């Protein structure tokens, strides 16, 4: 499996994580709209944009794994011990999220995403 390289703003390598240095917005439907700012391969800030998570902001440590061309698994744990695992498909522009909240409540959601900046 190819290793992931730190990426500048543009690359043609489909195994390089393209999100670093960019802000993305994912619409999970209903009142769940979230933005993710990827600072590096190990740091990201989450912004809740509407609904019950509006004004939520947290910077988390992330782990990024290349699954295949243009598809990456991104995992993190939030301060309240919520654990999130994304499969981010940059070819199809969709994120699949598996979330385990404190108390073992499990959610599986998905939605389209777009680069904001």
Map each language-model feature to its residues.
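Residue-level recognition of beta-strand termini and adjacent short loop/turns
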Residues: 38-42, 66-68, 91
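Beta-sheet ligand-binding and adhesion/scaffold domains
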Residues: 4-7, 75-117
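N-terminal glycine/threonine-rich, aromatic-flanked beta-hairpin/loop signature
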Residues: 32-62, 102
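Tryptophan-anchored aromatic micro-motifs
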Residues: 2-32
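Contiguous, well-ordered beta-strand patches that form the walls/edges
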Residues: 52-88
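Hydrophobic residues embedded in beta-strands of well-ordered beta-sheets
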Residues: 42-45, 71-72, 93-95
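Short beta-strand segments that buttress and anchor functional surface loops
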Residues: 24-28, 46-49, 74-78, 97-100
């Amino acid at each position: 499996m190819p290793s992931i390289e730190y990426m500048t703003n543009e690359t043609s390598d489909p195994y390089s994580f393209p999100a670093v240095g960019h802000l993305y917005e994912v619409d999970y439907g209903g009142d769940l709209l979230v933005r993710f700012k990827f600072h590096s391969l190990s740091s990201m800030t989450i912004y809740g944009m509407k609904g019950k998570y509006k004004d939520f902001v947290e910077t988390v440590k992330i782990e990024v794994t290349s699954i295949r061309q243009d598809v990456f698994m991104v995992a993190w744990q939030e301060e309240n011990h919520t654990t999130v695992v994304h499969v981010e498909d940059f070819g199809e522009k969709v994120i699949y999220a598996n979330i385990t909240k404190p108390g073992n409540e499990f959610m599986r959601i998905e939605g389209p995403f777009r680069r904001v900046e």
